[in-house]
Amino acid sequence: MSASHADQPTQTVSYPQLIDLLRRIFVVHGTSPEVADVLAENCASAQRDGSHSHGIFRIPGYLSSLASGWVDGKAVPVVEDVGAAFVRVDACNGFAQPALAAARSLLIDKARSAGVAILAIRGSHHFAALWPDVEPFAEQGLVALSMVNSMTCVVPHGARQPLFGTNPIAFGAPRAGGEPIVFDLATSAIAHGDVQIAAREGRLLPAGMGVDRDGLPTQEPRAILDGGALLPFGGHKGSALSMMVELLAAGLTGGNFSFEFDWSKHPGAQTPWTGQLLIVIDPDKGAGQHFAQRSEELVRQLHGVGQERLPGDRRYLERARSMAHGIVIAQADLERLQELAGH
């Protein structure tokens, strides 16, 4: 699937139509209807919001991973209530999003009761944008922080070989009078999916994103993908955050570190088999003024000092456009999706 439809014939589909199409694709290619529901909504949401590196661009990777037997598309997550503020989920070698969905209501109940709750997911495959995992909590007035480790492709600061994954972190918080503050970011200098897109489109990357197989700086995306590696953002600072993600998303949850799984016997596998941690906070338990109002005051001050666009603003604008006018997809991509759905 292409990530851009510039200079290509396009078609427009509604958000519900895209969800339905993707759902049928996942079922045809080996997931249960329940898993298909969750994955289709996640993928369609990314496409709707302009997060093209995690929208329909990801479908071939999902399907090749399913076909290889690497991930169980019919896995039923096992939710374990292990403490007043702690929930564990064994994803049973399935996708991470259904594991989160299975535990969400219990996690929210615990957060509202104790003021904070932790969800530790292990044995999971996360192949999607991370912001959809935290946004629903922010919409319910909660603060959420999530992190997931991925496959080895990032050289730690000062090291000679890759060890970490891109290891993204997502944050969501309610805001009075506006959309929730929601963003995610890779702890690598650039997301791995954006490198793949640049390679397909024949574009050079900005300097400082990665190295080739000899450890030399390169702006060629294919050199990074062909035996090279990404760099952490911000040098030692991003490297330290990536290490934190490994410890919390894998070490704490019981999932694999980014370097611990081996998919060599599953040709076509692309989904990292690792872990995920979520921390959910009920801000009403905090002191002072209403948290959402304080969030709005911070936003007002940011605008006052000249920051015109906040993290997530572009995504919300694209969402509004897509919901009003439909999601624009390259005609060739839509036809391919319809073929995959069995049309």
Swiss-Prot record:
Q: Name it.
A: Delta(1)-pyrroline-2-carboxylate/Delta(1)-piperideine-2-carboxylate reductase
For the keyword Nucleotide-binding, the answer is yes
Q: How is its activity regulated?
A: Is inhibited by the substrate analog pyrrole-2-carboxylate, and by 2-picolinate.
What's in the keyword line of the UniProt record? NADP, Nucleotide-binding, Oxidoreductase
- Please give the function described in this protein's UniProt entry: Catalyzes the reduction of both Delta(1)-pyrroline-2-carboxylate (Pyr2C) and Delta(1)-piperideine-2-carboxylate (Pip2C) to L-proline and L-pipecolate, respectively, using NADPH as the electron donor. Can catalyze the reverse oxidation reactions, albeit at a much lower rate. Is also able to catalyze in vitro the NADPH-dependent formation of N-methylalanine from pyruvate and N-methylamine; can act on other alpha-keto acids and specifically uses methylamine and not ammonia for these reductive amination reactions. Can use NADH instead of NADPH, although with much less efficiency.
Would you identify the family this protein belongs to, as annotated? Belongs to the LDH2/MDH2 oxidoreductase family.
The temperature dependence reads: Optimum temperature is 30-45 degrees Celsius. Is stable between 0 and 35 degrees Celsius after incubation of 30 minutes.
- Give the InterPro entries listed for this entry: Mal/L-sulf/L-lact_DH-like_ah, Mal/L-sulf/L-lact_DH-like_NADP, Mal/L-sulfo/L-lacto_DH-like_sf, Malate/L-lactate_DH-like
Q: What is its EC number?
A: 1.5.1.21, 1.4.1.17
Cite the binding residues for NADP(+): 126-130, 184-186, 236-237, 309-315
Q: Which residues bind substrate?
A: 58, 166, 192-193
Q: List the disulfide bonds.
A: none
The record's Gene Ontology biological-process terms are: methylamine metabolic process; proline metabolic process
Please name the Pfam families in this protein's record.
Ldh_2
Q: Tell me which domain of life the UniProt entry assigns to the organism this sequence originates from.
A: Bacteria
Reactions the enzyme catalyzes: L-pipecolate + NADP(+) = Delta(1)-piperideine-2-carboxylate + NADPH + H(+); L-proline + NADP(+) = 1-pyrroline-2-carboxylate + NADPH + H(+); N-methyl-L-alanine + NADP(+) + H2O = methylamine + pyruvate + NADPH + H(+)
Alphabetized GO MF terms: delta1-piperideine-2-carboxylate reductase activity; identical protein binding; N-methylalanine dehydrogenase activity; NADP+ binding; protein homodimerization activity; pyrroline-2-carboxylate reductase activity
Q: Which residues form the active site?
A: 53-54, 194
